[in-house]
Amino acid sequence: MPLQTLAENEIIATLLALALLLLSAYSLGTLMEKIKAPRVVGEITGGILLGGTLLYRFFPDLMSGIFMAYEGEGKVLNIFCQMGLVFLMFLSGYNTKIEADRNNAKTIGLVFTGATILPMAAAVPFVSMFKGYFAGESGDIISFMLVFLIGIAITSIPVISKIFFDMGIMNTRFANTVLTVSTFQDLCLWILLNAATRIAEKGEVKLSDMLLVAGFTLGLFVLAKFVSMHAHKFRKKIPAITFFSVSFILLLTVCAVLSYFGINIMYAAFLVGYLVKSFVGDESGSDAKKRMDSLADFAFSFFVPVYFALVGIKLNLVNDFSLVRFVLFFALAFGLEGLGTLLFVSFTKLKRTTKINFAITMNARGGPGIVLATVAYSYKIINLEFFTVLILTTMLSSLIAGYWLRHVQKKDGSIFTEL
């Protein structure tokens, strides 16, 4: 079968572009970690510096010679970008635990309602105000509204987990509550995002179609949850090469097959990760856990940084950005989620500082916020300005959450263990 290949100079240009993306993402990511900030913020910033905000603005010929050296280089790089998204969601699915602590059920329910349902409902009147500035070429109001509302309420499990781990509070009641709520929240929001992309793709809105897509998407997760409850019976030791090969075959095949049924790659990869955990387990010290950790180390040192850097390189904070509209959206998103959480946790007997901690922590958008922006932009649901606003909102909210929690810990180290 004759397949078209890249010329040697095109391969070299692609490798150079990847190396520069990795170098920039690694350098800025490491810098952010040194100042106790989320690494993802640095990796995106590394991409921003390469793009129209700085280097491409002042050295267009040089940067074009690297990232646009031949026709179609952007498409080649986009493959690595998509693989970063796939592995990010695959690993997120593997690390997802849908288990509610019965002793803490009231707090979990109140935080979920205050951080998800209330802010999304309160944001509905603002959709029309921003639509004229933020809507994409698809022009579908329902898809845009769903993305807008998700952007208001989304929370990041990976970023929050990393912050908790670095602070040494990963197994506290506060951390467990936040992670449980974030898991349920992200599941609901992924379902809504999948519905939004499906509606945008079909170009028309029918209530029956919306219900069908939402039902099918939710049904897939229910099926995955059902399988996970019984899959442990079939666990057995398998060689590492078989483990990885079967996992990758399953991952790529399911992503391809489900796309024909209107399920986007992001959600499909999440489901596969969840299923793999069900069959192989995630017990600490087990062979499966060690293998997934090694896969995570590789993915988060190559594909994921490239993904975040390519997200950043698209941003142009000089031409495609309004500071006023960014401030308005950020204040709306941070304020509604924070106040909503604070309002509902006021019905508990938690300490005042703990209530504020929940309100600020649930605002950390991190990786899921980036995924939301890139998926919505790729389906033309949002334009470049809103894409930029969502990315910057994600970065700033994650920084605020991280620094706030460390500030509180310095004042009272026991605040997270005693709810």
Named regions from a protein language model:
Residues S27-K34, I98-M167, V311-G413:
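Transmembrane alpha-helices that form the ion-translocation and gating core
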Residues A7-L20, G72-M89, G139-T155, S208-L220, ...:
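Structural signature of hydrophobic alpha-helical transmembrane segments
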Residues A37-G46, N103-L118, R173-T180, R235-V246, ...:
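Cytoplasmic-side transmembrane-helix entry/capping segments in multi-pass membrane proteins
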Residues N104-L110, M170-Q185, V205-M210, G285-K290, ...:
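Membrane-interface alpha-helices at helix entry/exit sites of multi-pass transporters
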